[in-house]
Amino acid sequence: MTDINFGNISRLEEFISRARRIAIVTHMKPDGDAMGSCIALYHCIGMYGSASAKIIINDRYPGYLDFLAAEVPDSDMIVHAQLPTEAETAIKDSDLVICLDFNAFHRADRLEAALTESKADKILIDHHLNPAREAFDLVFSETDISSASELLYHILMETVKIGHDASMLPPAAARALMTGMTTDTNNFANSTYPSTFRMASALLATGVDRDEILSRLYNQYGENRLRVLGHMMKDLLTITEDGVAYMVLDKATLRHYNVGEGDTEGFVNMPLSIAEVRMSFLIKEDDDRVRVSIRSKKGTSANTCARLYFNGGGHENAAGGKLNMPADITDITEAAGYIERTTHEFFTRNNEHKE
């Protein structure tokens, strides 16, 4: 991890100290890292005086994160999909906007216009490639780190209020940081660094109950999750000659199994356990587009593939994107052909085609 600029830490504390209303914003379809970092920052802002803070999210978080969200008053977490006017007004009325776990305003989807038009000071805390630096007054960007939650943790450790003492973190913030880091590393399975384990050790020393967090994250699913997983592995999983595994979930299947946000969490990683698979796709049909999750093994760039063919990007081995209809494909039935065609081209042009 690159050393954090101490001058920027001072500026961050100045921005927060003088703000009266703060909006904390993350990307669309917020995951554990997005919510963990936002909720942790929310709890820490109270250490800086009388500023009011609200978490503004584009759409609802997965149900397995309810235990974190329960520690934030309902009035301080606004979901645009449920209360669009209130969400946009909260951003407009804020004099400081802090964006976590995304690198450009368009990643906030329906909040993009409100963020672009906001006259507030804007701060970015993110671990993705190619941040839109020109859109922000202060940027903390680090890619050699596990998660936005870990980046936020190291920033907080450098502040005057925390002073390298994790026990000074509000307990709810410590739990949220551990949760965000755990989910983004797939429980320490990927994107882990020495700093990641130091963070985990320090948080455990403060009394964070990791066993409880793991139980909340991974042992609270509904039966439908296993049912749809079985269907996907038996009937939907396709593996190409290029070593690409993909599964396409259309709206009919999503409805049949009552698949909600978060119910397919982690599924895209599973085909990578197959020796000959080097890239895995999970395709989910939405109303006006197709959502794409991509994972890859070391030596194959999920990020490059997402940027070239799927209107997205992310990390080297974990990325996301979308297929627009009808611009990219006419309907979901064309998704399989699109994946096979584009990934074959991707591996061929990068001299990665399997012999």
Summary of predicted features, one role per range:
Residues 122-124, 139-140, 244-246:
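Conserved beta-strand scaffold positions in the cores of enzyme catalytic domains, especially
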Residues 32-38, 105-109:
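Short glycine/serine/threonine-rich phosphate/pyrophosphate-binding segments
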Residues 2-26, 36-71, 75-80, 85-88, ...:
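Hydrophobic helix-and-loop "lid/oligomerization" segment in the mid-to-C-terminal part
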Residues 30, 102-104, 129, 187, ...:
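Short, glycine/acidic-enriched loop or turn micro-motifs at the edges of active sites
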Residues 78-135:
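Active-site cofactor/cluster-binding pocket
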Residues 56-58, 100, 125-127, 142-143:
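Generic beta-sheet signal
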Residues 41-42, 114-117, 140-141, 199:
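Glycine-rich, phosphate-binding/catalytic loops in enzymes
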Residues 127-200:
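Short alpha-helices
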